[in-house]
């Protein structure tokens, strides 16, 4: 049977899944270098212009309004006259050099056989996608990750799966693992452990890993995952009885978004989801993104520092979704993603699904570090607690677990976390 094809982004042509190509990687890297050089040139131009105008050290009240009107503008006018001509010439030269190098390499991209994936390469590309994934997608950069399902580090091939398991029988229960920000499917392999492989062997589940561009909006990835899972259920070699979902960090938000959007689209796969587990998921946001937004606002007060807010705007759509834990497009549409309060639509957990949440503190109980949760996600956010009743997820205490001395990434390998997962997911 055919492998599920990842859906294309809105306004984008469908992209075929392919293995890593060294030429594609080089082209993508060159595009990033050129784009970065152009952004730095623009930053220098803006700072130069402010110095030329002898602007007052603090900006007036209208500056905030200017910044709020556009995500990619700092409200500073472009240089004019000879100065502007020089900077435009530099920008044009950088663009021509970049386009020329890209054009020279393009014919070799398809001609050279794609190389095998490696954890090191994937870690770098996944990190780039987490920070700049929205830019990579909009600019057509080959480093942008198309959402796909994977197994054993390769795109899921259901035909091979059916043939390889013909003598043992194809599992009728699937464990879907959804990674977090700046991670890949290889990220589940940590310190000699993989929750997916271990739970799969113990419980007779087929572990399948989502691999996606974590720099895109959570709602975009949720919609794409919903469509891919509908195709997975249709193409699975035998009728599927059950889907169990395990989401780490942002992955839990993507899973929730996929379930909501799948229900709205009339998909059938949500009816097969019986259990949903969250590992350190920031259901109500993460303080580091809020700190980044606070720094952005402070920098915007001075016209001499304001050009540097362009650097803070490098935060991807996915990262800014983590400020409050956005799930739906309506949570971020209609305003600047860098200047908005929590205006999420309350999204309850799916009915008929047993939901579990694991949180942790990086320090010992009662230590100052315990106030920060696992180092990235506060305990209340990970457990779904909220002072507003409509936003509180209402996960039963018996379905919550709080560990201590466990960092955010160590949730992927800690023995106590695994034992808790095994206990919850084992048949009773």
Which residue stretches match the model-derived regions?
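Flexible, membrane-associating and regulatory peripheral segments of lipid-active enzymes
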Residues: 2-209, 415-419, 423-428
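Residue in the alpha/beta-hydrolase core beta-strand immediately N-terminal to the catalytic nucleophile
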Residues: 242-244, 257, 275-277
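Gly/Ala-rich beta-loop-alpha elbow adjacent to hydrolase catalytic centers
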Residues: 246-255
């Amino acid at each position: 049977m055919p492998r599920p094809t990842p859906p294309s982004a809105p306004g984008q042509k469908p992209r075929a899944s392919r293995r890593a190509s060294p030429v594609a990687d080089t082209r993508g890297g060159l595009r990033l270098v050129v784009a970065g050089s152009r952004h730095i040139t623009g930053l220098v131009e803006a700072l130069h212009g402010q110095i030329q105008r002898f602007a007052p050290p603090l900006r007036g009240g209208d500056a905030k309004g200017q910044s709020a009107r556009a995500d990619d503008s700092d409200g500073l006018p472009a240089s004019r006259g000879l100065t502007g001509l020089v900077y435009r010439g530099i920008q044009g030269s950088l663009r021509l050099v970049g386009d020329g190098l890209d054009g020279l390499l393009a014919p070799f991209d398809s001609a050279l056989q794609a190389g095998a994936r490696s954890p090191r390469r994937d870690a770098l590309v996944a990190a780039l996608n987490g920070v700049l994934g929205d830019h990579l997608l909009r600019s057509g950069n080959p480093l942008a990750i198309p959402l796909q399902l994977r197994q054993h580090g390769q795109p899921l091939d259901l035909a091979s799966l059916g043939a390889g398991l013909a003598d043992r029988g194809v599992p009728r229960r699937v464990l879907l693992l959804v990674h977090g920000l700046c991670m890949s499917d290889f990220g589940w392999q940590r310190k000699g452990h993989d929750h997916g492989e271990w739970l799969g062997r113990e419980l007779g589940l087929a572990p399948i890993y989502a691999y996606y561009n974590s720099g895109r909006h959570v709602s975009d990835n949720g919609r794409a995952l919903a469509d891919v899972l509908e195709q997975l259920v249709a193409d699975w070699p035998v009728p599927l009885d059950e889907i169990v979902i395990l989401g780490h960090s942002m992955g839990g938000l993507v899973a929730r978004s996929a379930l909501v959007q799948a229900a709205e689209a009339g998909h059938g796969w949500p009816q097969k989801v019986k259990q949903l587990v969250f590992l350190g998921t920031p259901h109500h946001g993460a303080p580091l993104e809020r700190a980044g937004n606070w720094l952005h606002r402070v920098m915007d007060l001075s016209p001499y520092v304001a050009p540097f807010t362009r650097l803070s705007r490098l935060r991807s759509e996915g990262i800014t979704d983590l400020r409050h834990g956005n799930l739906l497009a309506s949570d971020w549409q209609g305003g600047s993603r860098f200047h908005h309060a929590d205006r999420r639509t309350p999204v309850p957990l799916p009915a008929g699904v047993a939901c579990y949440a694991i949180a942790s503190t990086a320090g010992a109980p009662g230590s100052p570090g315990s106030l920060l949760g696992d180092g990235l996600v506060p305990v209340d956010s990970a457990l779904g607690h909220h002072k507003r009743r409509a936003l509180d997820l209402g996960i039963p205490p018996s379905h919550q677990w709080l560990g201590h001395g466990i960092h955010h990434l160590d949730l992927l390998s800690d023995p106590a976390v695994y034992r808790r997962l095994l206990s919850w997911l084992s048949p009773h």
